[in-house]
Curated annotation (Swiss-Prot):
It is an enzyme of class 3 (hydrolase). Its main location: cytoplasm. Its cofactor is Zn(2+). One of its GO terms (molecular function) is N-acyl-D-amino-acid deacylase activity. This is D-aminoacylase. Keywords: Cytoplasm, Hydrolase, Zinc. Belongs to the metallo-dependent hydrolases superfamily. N-acyl-D-amino-acid deacylase family. The gene is dan. The keyword rRNA-binding does not apply. It is found in: Cytoplasm. PANTHER family: COLLAPSIN RESPONSE MEDIATOR PROTEIN (PTHR11647:SF1), HYDRANTOINASE/DIHYDROPYRIMIDINASE FAMILY MEMBER (PTHR11647). GO terms for cellular component: cytoplasm. Has a wide specificity; hydrolyzes N-acyl derivative of neutral D-amino acids.
């Protein structure tokens, strides 16, 4: 045994079941940590440790990686990141749906960029400045950051309701190049949203050219997730092919009652594309989604709940149908007078949700909106809901598969080296949970309830969540992508 091997561990988790993030069966073993790394796995009963924790009867897993967040500003404003660490998340991927906090200096960013804003939040003219701020004031979790196409448009174009000119495309491409060179892991788009709805496929391809040279990811909230979802998928695949870069289909779903069941159509299309090019997807475990309040979404949804409303804050948490009735209007016609606002939309079918979650390559991403006054419960409950409700209670897949979908798979697809698995030499991002009791307790009525069954969470070897509370340690780092 070398001198380094004989040194006491800083942390020793003893007697737990290790589910290592590789989608293989769990095994009983001890895990030792030195500094920010996993130092040893096996029978460590005779080893010395500064801190030894008996985790008998509990699962030790890699910290969960939230593949789809809007935590860009929350990482700076609420550095404890309690909605995430309380459910075992140790890394968040930001800059999704075309929305990133940089590069943009803007006092009043257009919707949906305002989903990240708390007033004065858009102050970083370069992506490097944003990453520098994250490094200067680290959060409790790691962050892997993308740059958003809608943010680039807002930075360059005085009028977003048109296609970009060649000069504007070149300016956006320069900003994208700066972001990628500074450490962005990819570029996201959200052509579903007004700021980018007029962007052509060719514009997106040209703005995203820096991805090819930097080995970055192209992630997309597709142009349509309802009636025209097949055309949207084809556009997404084309962009990936022309740039020769990995594609991530964000929060895959089929929206609106007329489209219920169409995951039987979309998943084979995605699987076929995977055989030809690098395609990934993620999903959240709910039949309701949440974003800005939009008239077209209101028509698709069976029920709509207001999550925030700037002109009428008292409407947060109210049902849109009730508000419309009180004002003597249809729910469609009442939307303009409530702007800007956000909403939860019940518009998916449970069999589709289960089919997408059970699809082998599907990663787990919360898509939570942390600045909403009454957020969708996915912000607090996504990961324990997959582990408890879908894996344990419904038996949709084994616990080991559930863990893989939120750890090893995600780390591999996003190129997060040394993360997502329990291996000696890997970073000590860890979650300890009770497989019998882990569960989401956040509901649409009480959306900020903490998960049950999460014992403790470690980020880069430091404890960040113990005894149902933040420990005060801001151990997170800005993560780079290692291209495959």
């Amino acid at each position: 045994m070398s001198q380094s091997d004989s040194q006491p561990f800083d942390l020793l988790l003893a007697g737990g079941t290790l589910i290592d993030g590789s989608n293989t069966p769990g095994r009983r073993a001890d895990l030792g940590v030195r500094g920010d790394r996993i130092a040893a796995i096996g029978d460590l009963s005779d080893a010395a440790a500064h801190t030894r924790v008996d985790v008998s009867g509990l699962v030790v897993a890699p910290g969960f990686i939230d593949s789809h967040t809007h935590d860009d500003n929350y990482l700076l404003r609420r550095r404890d990141m309690t909605p995430k660490i309380s459910q075992g998340v140790t890394t968040v991927v930001t800059g999704n749906c075309g929305i990133s906090l940089a590069p943009l200096a803007h006092a009043n960013p257009p919707a949906p960029l305002d989903l990240l804003d708390e007033g004065g939040s858009y102050r970083f003219e370069r992506f490097a400045d944003y990453l520098d701020a994250l490094r200067a004031t680290p959060a409790a979790v790691n962050a892997a950051c993308m740059v958003g196409h809608s943010t680039l448009r807002a930075a360059v174009m005085p009028d977003l309701q048109r296609a970009a000119t060649d000069e504007e495309i070149a300016a956006m491409r320069d900003l994208a190049e700066e972001a990628m060179a500074s450490g962005a892991i990819g570029i996201s788009t959200g052509a579903f949203y007004p700021p980018a709805a007029r962007a052509t496929t060719e514009e997106i391809i040209e703005v995203c050219r820096p991805l090819s040279a930097h080995g970055g990811i192209y992630a997309t909230h597709m142009r349509d997730e309802g009636e025209h979802i097949v055309a949207a998928l084809e556009e997404t695949f084309r962009i990936g092919r022309e740039l020769d870069v990995p594609v991530v289909i964000s929060h895959h779903k089929v929206m609106g009652q007329p489209n219920f069941g169409r995951s039987r159509e979309t998943l084979p299309l995605i699987e076929a594309a995977m055989a030809r090019q690098d395609v990934s997807l993620d999903a959240y475990p709910y039949v309701a989604g949440s974003t800005m309040l939009k008239q077209d979404r209101v028509l698709l949804a069976g029920r709509t709940i207001i999550t925030w409303c700037k002109p009428f804050p008292e409407l947060s948490g109210r049902d849109l149908d009730e508000v419309a009735a009180e004002r003597g209007k249809s729910k469609y016609d009442v939307v303009p007078e409530l702007q800007p606002a956000g909403a939860i939309y019940f518009m998916m079918d449970e069999p589709d949700v289960q089919r997408i979650l059970a699809f082998g390559p599907t990663m787990i991403g919360s898509d939570g909106l942390p600045h909403d006054e009454r957020p969708h419960p996915r912000l607090w409950g996504t990961f324990p809901r997959v582990l408890g409700h879908y894996a344990r209670d419904l038996g949709l897949f084994p616990l080991e598969t559930a863990v893989w979908k939120m750890t090893g798979l995600t780390a591999a697809r996003f190129g997060l080296a040394g993360r997502g698995q329990l291996q000696a030499g890997y970073f000590a991002d860890l979650v300890v949970f009770d497989p019998a009791t882990v569960a989401d307790t956040a509901t649409f009525e009480h959306p900020t309830e903490r998960a049950a069954g999460i014992h403790s969470v470690y980020v880069n070897g430091a404890p960040v969540w113990q005894e149902q509370a933040f420990t005060g340690q801001h151990a997170g780092r800005v993560l780079a992508r290692t291209a495959a």
